UniProtKB/Swiss-Prot annotation:
InterPro entries: K+_transporter, K_trans_C, K_trans_N, Kup. It catalyses: K(+)(in) + H(+)(in) = K(+)(out) + H(+)(out). GO terms for molecular function: potassium ion transmembrane transporter activity; symporter activity. The keyword Cell membrane applies. One of its GO terms (cellular component) is plasma membrane. Pfam families: K_trans, K_trans_C. It is a multi-pass membrane protein. Keywords: Cell inner membrane, Cell membrane, Ion transport, Membrane, Plasmid, Potassium, Potassium transport, Symport, Transmembrane, Transmembrane helix, Transport. It comes from the Bacteria. This is Probable potassium transport system protein Kup. The gene is kup. Belongs to the HAK/KUP transporter (TC 2.A.72) family. Its main location: membrane.
Amino acid sequence: MSAESHPTESQMTPKKLFYLTLGSIGVVYGDIGTSPLYAFREALKPVAHDGLTRFEVISLISLMIWALTIIVTIKYVLFLLRADNEGEGGTLSLLALLMKTANGHTAILMLLGLLGAALFLGDAMITPALSVLSAVEGLKLVTPRLSEYIVPISVVILALLFVVQSRGTGAVAKFFGPITAVWFLVMAAAGISHISDDFGILAAFNPYYAVSFLLHEGFYGVVVLGAVFLTVTGAEALYADLGHFGRRPIQWAWFLLVFPSLTLNYLGQGALVLGKPETMSDPFYLMYPQWALLPVVILATAATIIASQAVITGAFSMVRQGINLGFLPRREILFTSETNTGQIFVPSVNAVLFIGVIFLVLSFKTSDALATAYGISVTGAMVVTSIMAFEFVRARWNWSLPVAVIALAPLVILELIFLGANLLKIHDGGYIPILIATAFTVIMWTWRRGTAILMEKTRHTDIPLASFVSSIERKSEHSPAQVPGTAIFLTSDPESAPAALLHNLKHNHVLHDRNVILTIRTVNKPRVPSQDRYKVEQISERFSRVELLFGFMESQNVSQALATLRKAGLKFDIMSTSFYLGRRKLVPDANSGMPYWQDRFYILLANAASLPSDYFHLPANRVVELGSQIIV
């Protein structure tokens, strides 16, 4: 289900609401739905070093339930789902919205947004590795002889998952929701069946246990919080996938199925450990009888594959947003569905994620080891989102400063505590998500900054378009020869004569019957209605200026968009139209405004970018490229 296809809240029929709710269970809640596989197990380890007490077990479950309540229910389900950018959610969508109203702190907001996006991309590497490993590890309970095959089996599953990305998931995506719904029901049933082991576990609903535990445990309490946070990993997907399903389906799925199922399962795990402390080694799988283990492992593996698919798709979508907003160089984007433009495949991103995921599996080998590295990227992304949400309620909802502080400061403080708890795990692998996020942030910041410097340098040597057209339209003996047809010159600055136009005149001494100065601009909203797609200005008899507007969630298909210009009186015969593009050779300069290494890195990114003709879907046999050299 795509954002392009779901109706508005008021138009949603009960049937549509049901299918969107079911779909959201697989895509939105797949990640958080796999947390019971390892969250409670990891939380038990720091407190079980000197024996496990009844108070500690109840307190851990209490911490998990209240983490789900405060962070997921209150922050995401009830609050953030309303902070949308024309129906879209996610870090970059929120950043695009805030950039419209940023007053004096644009750079800080941008850096925060880029950091949040980078942390999400790091999460997209860790989630598949951790989820699949934790599911496949159930095989060692089926038969210990399979223990040595857990890593190879996980690698094969993940390799197949990334290989099939290029073929799209449309054919099987309709099963994601039902399979994940069954997964939640199975978890709920297991939890219910074991709560009777010790009804005392129901005391976990009392926040006294959570608070008292933290106050009495001291350092160990902080360490435990890092593991407790695994309970809410995947919550960012609620906001990121807002545009795919809408607010109501996501909320209904949470309150009717996901939240109750997770709560019941954690209560069941807690009751099991209270009754049988020896089960703390793997309380999730040990809730099931021996005959049910293999089916549950298979179902768990399917659920983790679906969760991994959702986060991979989210990474593709975020990269497309980043490219359209100018934070990333153009990359090849393929569409895997003829009817759903939301189903995309980005080969370069798929390759990077695949290499990263396999590296993590082979390096950490167990979900225990990998879980220590998981929380940092998620907590970091949540803190960034909360800070940006503070700016949102001030700028868009006009909340006063005291109201915004009272409402959001407790959330930010809580998440900072969780972040601090996770940072304690840096030496145990927590440095991995930090390195990944740093790398992606440097890439995006370098591209954004380098492009701004490049624009500034070219602006100094540009000729105003109005002056150029005025001079060229004066008939004289030096006037260039006129040739039939249409020439379209792509430029990022509609006020200046494109470099390709100047080079064409300089080297070929010709001018076409009709010349279109074309600018492609991405606006800070998800989509642009077809009637607002273009702006046309007739400069002279032979020159016109056209601006094509795209939302950051849209494919920038220029050939298709130009066809809509017929309504404005501009008709293009593709066989007599040539597209002129400027190709720049960039030379590093130590005094450009960026360090020399960053200049070199920017040039590397620029050289690796997809060709404009490919990215903008221009007919290859109608494209002419003219080069120039620029020092950056």
